[in-house]
């Protein structure tokens, strides 16, 4: 069930065509984000996202508007995938690893907001479940211990 998402403003980039052809030869679905829905790359794709943007304000700046549009579309796609795959609770990203101090603080804030608990309770929940944010949120919301919360999440 793999899918390739290609990006090409013009739809004329040869190495993008090559990657698309390779993915297609492996049986993958191929989608494309491009400004030119009639390009060769668009003809190779199973799905084409081609926003109609109009001309850039100042010509010659390497399709700045198209690049920004592609970035916005990618953010929408990844946000949708995060929600669909269970990485989001309410509007909070709960599948967050604490790889540094900033992310550890973000985990605490998420558990506090999702669970309506104090900082001390959030830290204690995170410490008891090896800093698995989603597990800590479930613990605070339900009163389950770390093991039971982890098992319940694994089942769903």
Report the location of each language-model feature.
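Glycine-rich phosphate-binding loops that contact phosphosugars or nucleotide phosphates
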Residues: 1-85
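Short, amphipathic alpha-helical interaction segments embedded in low-complexity terminal/linker regions
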Residues: 81-156
